[in-house]
């Protein structure tokens, strides 16, 4: 599809980073040290927009949570943890120096760990452990990069083009862990053990988008030449997650894998130097993905199951929710003139024009898979027969529908509004015959394919949905380092290191203090005798 968009900032994406810059800095000059410790907050247009978007999604999810979590024992604790999670994301968005970045980055990891483990069962505990360990890798890489930035005498990463390649590589790898790019993708589907409001917030504009946001901030360093690592890993992540979503039967995990696929698209566009298009897709995706998770929560709450093989007849029980799910699925496919269409099509067309054959083919196949699993959700959940006759009651009440309809208009109109904002109001869309045929073919084949491939065999389904046994591979890879760490802890910190270090010093200190106390509190005869012996000792030796 040939799209002509008169975007004044398309070829100069740095303008996006320099509009409305209002620096507010406090320099704490350390005496006799050449290093200036700077705490700064820089307000620019892109940061302000994503902050408003995160605030909009967070407010609607909090309203949704107050009704969805009604009846839970520790609902107040849950709400406070959600507020901490949102505050960490706000701190990350508003930061422009390494220290505040680290506080927000680490706060997201800790609060997400607590929220995933909200339900007290083995699945939640194991999922929380996978999440925190994966995010710890990114935290270590961030700390490492901050240590290297110390030698540049500033932690302000507003202009990172002056930094070395090693610092950029550390930031890229840390963003891979937070945004669940290969090979750190295992934790994202596992995080679906959390309550549905947490999933809605995590996958729309907070945790998983933190890595993308960091790469957008660092994009001036590589947007001219591109980054082939981001291109390849983004395309592979999008392809494997789309294939896994096609073989998955858990409704929430399918939506989570669709998020992972779109994160791969964003990384792919960043690697090509299409920073504005990546930001556009992040904006559009956040609008309909939060809505899609909230609708899935209504369906799961009404039917009492998450397995889409046991769902059906939802359109007759939940007509409004079914309609919103259909609109969100079409937007996820990139159906013309919905929010997902504008950004995704720009990325695909630009990737074709840049003549990168293998990643572009993978991205086209990923778009086909996106249409396939989105159609499968609609076919199984909305159109098929309901086999769960004991749970036919509706949860479509005013309290649930209010946040859904607020975000619905964003999912329908948000992409076009964003396009008007960054094009100056001059937008013309011309559909060429060849590329419009390619777009319609991808959507049509994706819609028809689930009717022919209605089910996988058990072994094939497990193989595909696990992203080619990625959790097993990454788990076995981390087994030996964790085992060595446990052995070093028990044999070292709790063994001979403890006995030869702190314990020995403690015992010797106790003995010395006891002897000193005995000498100072003894009768005068003992004190005089000890003084005499000490004098004789000093005289002869």
Curated annotation (Swiss-Prot):
InterPro entries: NADH_DH_su5_C, ND/Mrp_TM, NU5C-like. The keyword Membrane applies. GO terms for cellular component: mitochondrial inner membrane. The chain crosses the membrane at residues 17-37, 48-70, 74-94, 98-118, 130-150, 157-177, 191-213, 226-246, 263-283, 285-305, 322-342, 353-373, 404-424, 429-449, 455-475, 518-538. One of its GO terms (molecular function) is NADH dehydrogenase (ubiquinone) activity. GO terms for biological process: ATP synthesis coupled electron transport; electron transport coupled proton transport. Its EC number is 7.1.1.2. It is found in: Mitochondrion inner membrane. Keywords: Electron transport, Membrane, Mitochondrion, Mitochondrion inner membrane, NAD, Respiratory chain, Translocase, Transmembrane, Transmembrane helix, Transport, Ubiquinone. Pfam families: NADH5_C, Proton_antipo_M. The keyword NAD applies. It is a multi-pass membrane protein. It catalyses: a ubiquinone + NADH + 5 H(+)(in) = a ubiquinol + NAD(+) + 4 H(+)(out). Core subunit of the mitochondrial membrane respiratory chain NADH dehydrogenase (Complex I) that is believed to belong to the minimal assembly required for catalysis. Complex I functions in the transfer of electrons from NADH to the respiratory chain. The immediate electron acceptor for the enzyme is believed to be ubiquinone. Belongs to the complex I subunit 5 family. This is NADH-ubiquinone oxidoreductase chain 5. It comes from Artemia franciscana. The lineage of its organism: Eukaryota, Metazoa, Ecdysozoa, Arthropoda, Crustacea.
